[in-house]
């Protein structure tokens, strides 16, 4: 099957690697070339802000596959190689070394890059103690600077910022976290969940300052290091290390230059195809119409990358892909496991199951009577049950969700019975 067809995958992150190995597992017999500008063996990214930063994981433990697995599966890994252009007429990608690779199918798994802090240009961006956290090199540089009693300023109150703050506190650093928003995790959680995490971090020793805008930096006399962070309210924060995490920009430039449709991501259809049917896109860079939510989304998560990669492998090998599953995310901070399923945008009320005073609760986001999303804190069973509620769009009784005397599995069973009798 497809013995003479060439697949070129641009991007050696999780999505790209999973497409390559998924194709082989699904029976693809043609050539598979995996091209990326990273010079290291493809690796997992989430542990960079957690176990790896804390010194509890090695670089080797992060490998997506062992180095010899690529050759064993006849997958050609071209690391340290940038794709500079796509020639759609010739069905070729042009590499930075001048070579051209033919393709019958092209998969763009270009991922994203950290959103730059506008005031961190010039010498600031080149300073060794000012970092974003996206690559293994970033994590290694930061890990070397997690020194007890040193001062860390974290800019950004999203998952990355909070995870880095938690790791640094455990390393006995003095940590200040700044966020322009009125609360941490404002974009993704309800106010009570934000309040829980703000309290958690403050109790651990993090100085959280919301509604705070960074306006500049002070540099050492040799312009090699940041020495202080300056805020619009006049605050000056001395710093030995500064880490910024204010979001991700999808890497769409290659697609845009090739004339593909781009709109906050590379636009794809239900078959994972871009505006050119021979070119597909996957992962953080891909924007698609969600059947679950009936709107266009671009999802930055490991589970989404895995699901889309498997879908591409199935489609290219002539198999039926799985239906869309509810997207989910996770974040580990201190000893607390936050797992989230669904997309909460558009919710009009929340229902809390459990007590927000303890690290053991779930928060249901509803639009009318429909559950859009659920945040669970240290409740893995309810997390898995919530995935079923959202993926299957079960008509659960909202008034029972907050009643812990009624097991969630009974609420789900009643909803299934209602569906089957309808």
Curated annotation (Swiss-Prot):
Pathway note: Terpene metabolism; (R)-camphor degradation
Enzyme class: oxidoreductase
GO annotation (BP), single: (+)-camphor catabolic process
GO cellular component: cytoplasm
Enzyme Commission no: 1.18.1.5
Binding-site positions, FAD: 15, 37, 50, 83, 134, 284, 302
A Pfam family that the UniProt record links to this protein: Reductase_C
Domain of life: Bacteria
Keyword Flavoprotein among UniProt keywords: yes
Induction: Induced by camphor and repressed by CamR.
Needed co-factor(s): FAD
Keyword list, A-Z: FAD, Flavoprotein, NAD, Oxidoreductase
Subunit relationships: Homodimer or monomer.
Record function comment: The oxidation of camphor by cytochrome P450-CAM CamC requires the participation of the flavoprotein, putidaredoxin reductase CamA, and the iron-sulfur protein, putidaredoxin CamB, to mediate the transfer of electrons from NADH to P450 for oxygen activation.
Name by which UniProt lists this protein: Putidaredoxin reductase CamA
Gene that produces this protein: camA
